[in-house]
Regions:
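ABC ATPase C-loop
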Residues: 116-117
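Conserved catalytic motifs of ABC-family nucleotide-binding domains
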Residues: 120
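Conserved ABC ATPase "signature" region
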Residues: 77-95
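Catalytic Walker B motif of ABC-type/P-loop ATPase nucleotide-binding domains
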Residues: 124-128
């Protein structure tokens, strides 16, 4: 299992590619082939989830079980165990009864990632998971993602964080909806390649 990062300026197609991989955006051409029994878990940008949603942290994480149960069926004991495990894994069990809108940026991002974990997929898609977070929150999420990969989860994340990108196993460099580079981060994220992508904005 591995971590793949999608790197590129705003508007380069990172979020669109994640949406296609998640199955929420239909590709305009080509065919997407996936293996595995479960659909990927998709964690959107924090800004895509409204601050005013009247949800507790636990309720938000429980939404990760909807793919298994549907939004109207009662959660089973196993569902509750899965949700508890996701809350504990992200270190937010003590925040379970808090409203999402009351959380700090880092806490809220961990709640969204916990929702992704509750889906029990072997593919986790993350859109800018550390954008706008302080160093401590970024490091905590980075450590968590490393641990998930060690446990057999494949992680694909869009990021502007070049330090995090250089620590990944593979990198896709995007520009204007096109792939301009792929491979190991040290091969793709060269000074000349980054300069070319960002100077042509």
């Amino acid at each position: 299992m591995a971590t793949t990062v999608l790197v590129g300026p705003n508007g380069s197609g990172k979020s669109t590619l994640l949406g296609v991989l998640a199955g929420v955006i239909k590709p305009t051409s080509g065919v997407l082939v996936r293996t595995g029994d479960r659909p990927p878990a998709f964690v959107p940008q924090r800004g895509a989830v409204g601050d005013t949603l009247p949800l507790t942290v636990r309720q938000a994480v429980e939404m990760g079980r909807w793919g298994e149960r549907g939004p109207w069926r009662r959660l089973t004991r196993r569902d509750h165990t899965t949700v508890d495990a996701a809350l504990d894994r992200l270190g937010i069990g003590a925040l379970a009864s808090r409203q999402l809108g009351e959380l700090s940026g880092g806490q809220r991002q961990r709640a969204l990632i916990a929702q992704g974990l509750a889906q029990e997929s072997d593919l986790l898609l993350l859109d800018e998971p550390t954008t706008g977070l302080d160093i401590e929150a970024r490091e905590r999420i980075g450590e968590l993602l490393t641990a998930l990969v060690a446990d057999g989860v494949t992680v694909v994340q869009a990021t502007h964080d070049l330090e995090a990108a250089r620590a990944a196993d593979a990198c896709l460099l995007l520009q204007n909806g096109r792939l301009t580079g792929q491979g190991r981060p040290e091969q793709v994220l060269t000074t000349s390649a980054l300069t070319q992508v960002w100077q042509t904005l």
